[in-house]
Amino acid sequence: MSITKDQIIEAVAAMSVMDVVELISAMEEKFGVSAAAAVAVAAGPVETAEEKTEFDVILKAAGANKVAVIKAVRGATGLGLKEAKDLVESAPAALKEGVSKDDAEALKKALEEAGAEVEVK
């Protein structure tokens, strides 16, 4: 008569904790395995990707309507006319750094409507 899996499970369930520890040790020696190694691998840390919270808005090119882009840059950055013109003409250039996603997307939209080519990083 062979022992079934259910009978083995019932026998282990009836054992004390110390008896189960001794059984595990005996099985590790008999079969040359380690229960701790399998547990350590299964319980490894799970890495989570952090969501980026700060973005940089880069003016890649002014486009055909440079005057409208300069006005949009002045409105977004608070720069004077000459500074905004120099910034637009020196494209690619960083307009704003470390802004929120919503602010970066709003600035990108405004500049693209003026005819600029913009990138958010």
UniProtKB/Swiss-Prot annotation:
One Gene Ontology molecular-function label: mRNA binding
InterPro entries listed in its UniProt record: Ribosomal_bL12, Ribosomal_bL12_C, Ribosomal_bL12_C/ClpS-like, Ribosomal_bL12_oligo, Ribosomal_bL12_oligo_N_sf
A Pfam family annotated for this UniProt entry: Ribosomal_L12
Alphabetized UniProt keyword annotations: Ribonucleoprotein, Ribosomal protein
SUPFAM superfamilies linked to this entry: ClpS-like (SSF54736), Ribosomal protein L7/12, oligomerisation (N-terminal) domain (SSF48300)
GO-annotated biological processes: translation
GO cellular component terms, semicolon-separated: cytosolic large ribosomal subunit
Known function: Forms part of the ribosomal stalk which helps the ribosome interact with GTP-bound translation factors. Is thus essential for accurate translation.
Record text on subunit structure and interactions: Homodimer. Part of the ribosomal stalk of the 50S ribosomal subunit. Forms a multimeric L10(L12)X complex, where L10 forms an elongated spine to which 2 to 4 L12 dimers bind in a sequential fashion. Binds GTP-bound translation factors.
Family note: Belongs to the bacterial ribosomal protein bL12 family.
UniProt-recorded name of the protein: Large ribosomal subunit protein bL12
Source organism (scientific name): Escherichia coli O81 (strain ED1a)
Taxonomic classification: Bacteria, Pseudomonadati, Pseudomonadota, Gammaproteobacteria, Enterobacterales
